[in-house]
């Protein structure tokens, strides 16, 4: 389908973008356009003004800052996947990014756009939650920081206010103790289930476990029932199995033409088990 007629704005600063966004509640930000343009073409969204961030300086940064990697919201998926800094400090992010669609999409789509879209099958929301990252947002009312645990509130829903723009994404360095798994019918398809795990070990005991699940559930979410089975225990195949069973049982699954809730339950349980084992092997 063709796009409808639209009004287009290309601000030269983040402040100008915030001003434009605040003056019209039906306006929308466009970054890479890989989420917004398809829904506009299907007439599922009809913004009064499309505000393009492409000419705002400083939004494509990717840099190491202390124990964090800092990303601008306009950094593309391809840039992240191919970044030496990401490969060194956030290898799980590089691994997850290779599952995103196809090269053409990865060359255009952006980190900030994916996080703001809040798709439960999206790789970046899952990674941000598992790695305990955070986003900085700005509006005409000022700036604030949103922790990953507070960002995703429902299907395609985030805690961003309608007039807020993501300006920075901060993710703590995590070179080890991680696992990522995703199942899709074909390479480049949306994942029917994806799981990310990070954990630490000290004196043979597991700690600081974060397990995030997407794709099979209505929103990106952590799995505290699985985390509780692991924290304070010794990692073993039996413990990984017990955690995966407890975690998978605690979730509510979507059911559609691509897979039943029962099918997705099985996928999630196996992916949790595998990613726990992978994370343990990388500690």
Curated annotation (Swiss-Prot):
Q: Name one GO molecular function term.
A: FAD binding
An example of a Gene Ontology cellular component annotation for this protein is:
cytoplasm
Q: Which UniProt keywords apply?
A: Alkaloid metabolism, Cytoplasm, FAD, Flavoprotein, Oxidoreductase, Plasmid
Q: What is this protein called?
A: Nicotine 6-hydroxylase medium subunit
Tell what triggers its expression.
Expression requires the presence of nicotine and molybdenum.
Note the PANTHER family from the entry.
XANTHINE DEHYDROGENASE SUBUNIT C-RELATED
* Pathway(s) the chain acts in: Alkaloid degradation; nicotine degradation; 6-hydroxypseudooxynicotine from nicotine (R-isomer route): step 1/2; Alkaloid degradation; nicotine degradation; 6-hydroxypseudooxynicotine from nicotine (S-isomer route): step 1/2
Residue ranges annotated for the FAD-binding PCMH-type domain, each copy included: 1-176
Residues holding FAD: 31-35, 110-114
Which ranges form a coiled coil? none
Annotated compartments: Cytoplasm
Q: Which EC number(s) does the record attach to this protein?
A: 1.5.99.4
Catalysed reaction, written as an equation: (R)-nicotine + A + H2O = (R)-6-hydroxynicotine + AH2; (S)-nicotine + A + H2O = (S)-6-hydroxynicotine + AH2
Q: Subunit notes for this chain?
A: Heterotrimer composed of a large subunit (NdhL), a medium subunit (NdhM) and a small subunit (NdhS).
* Regulation of protein activity: Nicotine dehydrogenase activity is inhibited by tungsten.
Describe how this enzyme or protein is applied in practice.
Answer: Due to the increased usage of tobacco products, the industry generates solid and liquid tobacco wastes containing high concentrations of nicotine, which dissolves easily in water leading to the contamination of the ground water. Nicotine-degrading microbes can be used for bioremediation of these nicotine-polluted environments.
Q: Which GO terms describe its biological process?
A: alkaloid metabolic process; nicotine catabolic process
Give a short account of what the protein does: Component of the nicotine 6-hydroxylase, which is involved in the degradation of nicotine. Catalyzes the hydroxylation of the pyridine ring at C6 to form 6-hydroxynicotine. Can use both L-nicotine and D-nicotine.
* Cofactor requirement: FAD
Pfam families recorded: CO_deh_flav_C, FAD_binding_5
How the cofactor is bound: the record states: Binds 1 FAD per subunit.
């Amino acid at each position: 389908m063709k796009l409808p007629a639209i009004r287009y704005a290309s601000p030269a600063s983040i402040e100008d973008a915030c001003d434009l966004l605040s003056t019209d509640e039906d306006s929308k930000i466009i970054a890479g356009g890989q989420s917004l343009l398809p829904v506009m073409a299907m007439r599922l969204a009809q913004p009064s003004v499309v505000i393009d961030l492409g000419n705002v300086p400083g939004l494509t940064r990717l840099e190491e800052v202390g124990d964090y990697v800092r990303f601008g919201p306009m950094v593309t998926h391809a840039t992240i996947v191919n970044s030496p800094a990401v490969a060194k400090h956030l290898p799980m992010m590089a691994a997850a990014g290779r599952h995103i669609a196809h090269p053409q999409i990865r060359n255009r789509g952006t980190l900030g756009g994916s996080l703001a879209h809040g798709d439960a099958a999206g790789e970046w929301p899952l990674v941000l939650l598992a790695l305990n990252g955070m986003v900085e947002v700005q509006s005409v009312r000022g700036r604030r920081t949103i922790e990953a645990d507070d960002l995703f509130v429902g299907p395609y829903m985030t805690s961003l206010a309608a007039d807020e723009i993501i300006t920075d994404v901060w993710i703590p360095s995590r070179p080890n103790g991680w696992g990522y798994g995703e199942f899709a019918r074909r390479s480049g398809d949306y994942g029917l289930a994806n799981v990310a795990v990070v954990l630490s070990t000290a004196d043979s005991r597991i700690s600081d476990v974060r397990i995030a699940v997407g794709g099979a559930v209505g929103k990106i979410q952590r799995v505290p029932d699985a985390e509780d089975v692991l924290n304070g225990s010794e990692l073993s195949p039996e413990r990984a199995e017990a955690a995966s069973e407890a975690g998978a049982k605690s979730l509510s699954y979507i059911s559609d033409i691509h897979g039943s809730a029962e099918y997705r339950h099985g996928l999630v349980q196996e992916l949790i088990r595998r990613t726990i084992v992978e994370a343990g092997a990388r500690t």
